[in-house]
């Protein structure tokens, strides 16, 4: 997790702006530690989003994602997943990650990507993620993700 916190009370948090400084710095720090992505918490300690992605969790086939009010940018792929699946928006704290079997991130360039580890928690299961990826590939006609 990033040590930088998202400001859930700032209106700029919810819009794409040209200020990617925090995301760039945190993504570089993560890469230096051998990580692909970093996840931000807000001032209340709730999980928000990745530096370049939205984050989802799966428990017993049910999909969960942080609420917009946690301080995240509502990405295009997040919207796609929310539209095609029954997704519950809720507050998610790092200490509750053990209740989930799967985790994935989304963005328009990488699509739907599984997360193997977030902090101390490992996510080995991929059933729901594979179904989502296949559905997305079908919609895209294999153009984006052969």
Predicted regions and their residues:
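Helix-start/capping segments and mature chain N-termini
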Residues: 1-146
């Amino acid at each position: 997790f990033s040590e930088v916190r998202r400001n859930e009370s700032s209106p700029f948090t919810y819009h794409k702006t040209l200020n990617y400084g925090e995301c760039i710095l945190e993504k570089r720090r993560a890469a230096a530690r051998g990580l692909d992505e970093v996840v931000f918490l807000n001032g209340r300690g709730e999980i928000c989003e990745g530096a370049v992605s939205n984050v989802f969790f799966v428990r017993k086939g049910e999909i969960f994602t942080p609420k917009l009010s946690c301080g995240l940018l509502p990405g295009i792929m997040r919207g796609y997943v929310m539209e095609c699946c029954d997704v519950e928006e809720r507050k998610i704290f790092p200490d509750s990650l053990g209740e989930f079997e799967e985790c994935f991130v989304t963005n328009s360039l990488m699509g739907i990507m599984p997360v193997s580890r977030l902090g101390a928690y490992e996510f080995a299961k991929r059933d729901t993620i594979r179904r989502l990826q296949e559905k997305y590939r079908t919609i895209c006609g294999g153009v984006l993700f052969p």
